[in-house]
Design a protein with these regions (language model features):
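Non-heme Fe(II)-dependent double-stranded beta-helix
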Residues: 1-37, 44-144, 150-151
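Short, conserved beta-strand element in jelly-roll/cupin
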Residues: 152-170
């Protein structure tokens, strides 16, 4: 598979494999060192797959309610249509409603992620109240961007976390 950013081929010299981090085999200090050395942590199975499925379906149901998914909506297949703007005059309020489902918050602000971040920072941590949910259908993407400017401001005590709610190729 060819790697592209905004339609431009990424030189193979800039590509490599992601290194997976196993939480059970790492001390807190080793986690911090891995993050500092690699600039990321690739963690699998931090969140229970059942919880991911529930949150995914809750988000998909909200998207289905504005005609953006085909039935069965749990498959997450884009309909190519949308009544979102017709039914919700304020997109911010719509996405806030989607982002505040209990099942999604159980993941984004729950004990599993909180525990990982607390281990990394060495102190108790909490998740943001505001999350940026990116519901993107197959073949589409969120253009290349940098989260640090939006989240970290002038502190090094903020980390962003990307969660996938379906199988993806890495």
């Amino acid at each position: 598979m060819e790697a592209l950013i905004n339609g431009v081929k990424v030189p193979s010299s800039l590509l490599g494999s992601l290194k997976e981090t196993n939480l059970t085999n790492k001390t807190n200090e080793q986690l911090r060192n891995s993050l500092n050395d690699d600039g990321y942590l690739l963690l699998r199975d931090v969140i229970d797959k059942k919880d991911i499925t529930i949150a995914r379906n809750d988000v998909f149901e909200k998207l289905n309610n504005v005609d953006e998914l085909t039935d069965p909506f749990t498959e997450g297949i884009s309909s190519g249509r949308s009544r979102r703007d017709e039914l919700h005059k304020d997109r911010g309020i719509f996405w806030k409603d989607v982002s505040n489902t209990q099942s999604l918050r159980k993941i984004t602000n729950g004990n599993n992620l909180q525990s990982v971040f607390s281990r990394i920072f060495g102190i108790s941590s909490i998740g943001f109240d505001f999350i940026f949910l990116r519901a993107v259908s197959g073949g589409k993407f969120t253009h290349m961007h940098c989260d640090a400017g939006f989240f970290t401001r002038k502190t090094q005590k903020v980390l962003t976390c990307w969660l996938v709610f379906t199988d993806i190729t890495i």
